[in-house]
Design a protein with these regions (language model features):
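A short acidic, leucine-rich amphipathic alpha-helix
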Residues: 30-36
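Core SAM-dependent methyltransferase catalytic element
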Residues: 334-355
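Conserved Class I S-adenosyl-L-methionine-dependent methyltransferase catalytic core
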Residues: 2-13, 21, 50-158
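Conserved adenosyl
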Residues: 99-225, 230-261
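Short amphipathic alpha-helical interaction segments
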Residues: 39-50
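A short glycine-rich, Lys/Arg-flanked "PGG" loop and its adjoining helix->strand segment in the class I
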Residues: 258-270
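Short helix-to-turn junction characteristic of helix-turn-helix DNA-binding domains
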Residues: 22-26, 177
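C-terminal alpha-helical "lid/dimerization" subdomain adjacent to the S-adenosyl-L-methionine
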Residues: 277-332, 339
Length: 355
């Protein structure tokens, strides 16, 4: 209970910019931090005292009066709580838990009906950018270079073409284009709002000439319904012209993953590879499971599985997509080979699928 409540206070720190203010402007009293962030001193004092009591912040003189105490972020906590460009940044998790909790009554009803709850709105927290730092710092600087032949092709001539399916707000596509200056990347996602954000991000990064984004359903050209942004939305297109197709942490969130893999296969040139990165889970069900497995199952119960249950043809995969499950989807899609790659990617496992 203490940990759950503490995460709610982290939500407040992230939402109100309290960590950022301490990081950017240094130690502060409760009145100073309230002034910096446009908040109320008494609320801020309670938040600061809680954070110091729990060790998330430090205080220069605990014996000083309540209004005289100055609080600061310990250096080791800055990457986790304040530096959004660091791969260790985790303060966004507070917002994710708050959003998920808001959905729980509808999820409970979906458990009874067997359908899907209404889509969970991003407001008021806004769309989280939890993968931004990870993708920009690791995807194309460490993970893809660990796949030697893929890395070589992306660096070579003629310039490679890459399709990034389920690209979200575009950070995976942008990361690849930044690391490999010869390539062009076409990102596809069924979320039109995410695509609009991705285009903005690419423009801000100066990559609009090599990175394009299209709202399209990765499940194929005739897709419509819950997985599509609108009836009859076209699929990713450009069949047979891509040297590399990627699906980074998105396949388990698709209601029809085999259809998405089939569309990806059609997009590949010869020779070409589909790289799938998805959750690093155990090969078989175990109980009790590791903390990491418990984490993936929890998100599957409250978010990943409910999101796809509205499609009558859903595969109902959930976040715990084991290698055997992906192998079955791959063979259904017409792939002949699936290889688990030796890429050290933390909580992700990398697969290569070829014709």
């Amino acid at each position: 209970m203490t940990g759950a409540l503490e995460l709610l206070t982290v939500y407040l720190g992230e939402r109100l910019g309290l960590y950022q203010a301490l990081y950017a402007d240094g130690p502060a009293t409760s009145a100073e931090l309230a002034a910096r962030t446009g908040t109320t001193e008494r609320y801020i004092r309670e938040w600061l005292e809680h954070h110091a009591a729990g060790g998330l912040l430090e205080v220069d003189d605990p014996a000083a009066g309540p209004l005289a105490r100055r609080y600061f972020l310990p250096p080791g906590h800055v990457p986790v709580l304040a530096d959004t460009g660091d791969v260790r940044y985790q303060a966004f998790n507070g917002a994710e838990i708050v959003r998920a909790a808001r959905w729980m009554p509808e999820v409970a009803e979906a458990f009874r009906s067997g359908g899907a709850p209404p889509p969970l709105p991003w407001a008021p927290e806004g769309r989280p950018e939890f993968n931004r730092a990870v993708f920009l710092n690791l995807l194309a600087k460490q993970w893809l270079p660990a796949i030697a032949d893929v890395d070589l092709r992306l660096r070579g001539e003629p310039p490679a073409r890459v399709a990034d399916l389920a690209c979200g707000t575009g950070w995976s596509s942008i990361a690849m284009a930044q690391a490999y200056p010869l390539i062009s990347v076409d990102g596809f996602d069924l979320d039109a709002d995410a695509i609009a954000a991705a285009r903005r991000h690419a423009g801000e990064a100066g990559l609009a000439d090599r990175v394009t984004f299209t709202a399209a359903d990765a499940s194929g050209p005739d897709a419509s319904g819950p997985d599509a942004s609108g009836p009859g939305m076209p699929g990713p297109g450009m069949p047979g012209q891509y040297d590399l197709v990627t699906i980074i942490e998105g396949l388990h969130d698709m209601s029809r993953p085999a259809d998405a893999l089939r569309a990806a296969r059609a997009m590949l040139a010869e020779p070409g590879s589909l790289i799938v990165a998805d959750e690093l889970v155990e090969d078989e069900f175990t109980a009790p499971a590791s903390i990491q497995e418990q984490y993936h199952y929890a998100w599957s119960v409250v978010a990943c599985l409910p999101a796809v249950m509205g499609d009558p043809d859903t595969a109902a995969t959930g976040a715990v997509m084991r290698p055997a499950t992906l192998r079955r989807y791959a063979f259904e899609a017409g792939f002949q080979n699936l290889e688990i790659l030796q890429v050290n990617a933390g909580m992700l496992r990398f697969y290569r699928l070829t014709r």
